[in-house]
Amino acid sequence: MNSKQRQVRRLTRRNALKILGSAIGLPVSILGVRNFASSPMLVQWHGEALGAEASLSLWHPNPRVARQAVIMIGSELRRLESIFSLYQTDSEILRLNKEGKLSLPSREFVEVLDVSTKIYNVSDRAFDPTIQPLWDLYSKHFSAERSNNATLETERIVAACKLVSFAEVEVGSQAINFSRKGMALSLNGIAQGYITDYITDLLRNEGFDNAMVEMGETRALGAAPDGQPFIVNLMNPIQPSLIDRSVSLTNEALSVSGGYGMLFSERGAHHIFDPLTGNSANRLLDVSVIAPSAVIADGLSTAIYVAGEQAAKNIIGSYPSARATLTRVDGSTIQL
């Protein structure tokens, strides 16, 4: 199989987002929902999904219906975490990582890997879900006592990189297999987007017209109840304490990728790796992508952040409905 093509057959960066209720800039938590003509009521939920902060803001004339939806969503989140979580010892992904194979994978697992395959290919391997060996290496090294600024030996990075190759993952409806012992998946760069879409679609099927879904990625169902877009404010990647950018969302999703989301060391080692070098990606400060679905926005923001500006146009061009904003290392921005 060609090493560059596969055939189908976070502390996290999410803290960079602050969801606001409508174009007037009122936080969701204090929206005056009774001011809207249809008098929808706001019901909110806050929790976690795959280790990231998660929240729902639902508007419905009958708050009991919204609360029942939240209960249903909680059950679905637990089921999805049993597939994708790296923290549940019996999850599908951990069983695959431990054994190198997984029989009868869930439909959701296969769907995420199929989306990953396309982004892996169009990004020329910049997006590679098999980077878990690098995560394990960095995490163990920098969590050791007095190693915050200790240099990670090149030989260890090179050894871990030899286990990174999504082209060597065989994906099928009956089984998923690694071709090499020691390989491991991390779907944190795309599964949260998939879950965000899943919950959004569930709400739409339950009759909701207005919702903001944050399951590690952000997706707007419809607009705010007053008909205005939802506004999402983003932090400044150079000074994370500042919020100086905003985007409007109506029936769209947003993902932001940046190394500031989780730093391993004061020297800049972080959680988004270049699978070709094994080092933390450093071509850009951050990337925000808006797309019709959160799973695409999630994968593309990671891919472009790793690949850099020169490759970004080709990557985003493969998804005509998506658009991206790149923040260069000098702080300037470019929109694609």
Q: What name fits each language-model region?
A:
Residues 1-336:
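Mature catalytic core of soluble alpha/beta enzymes
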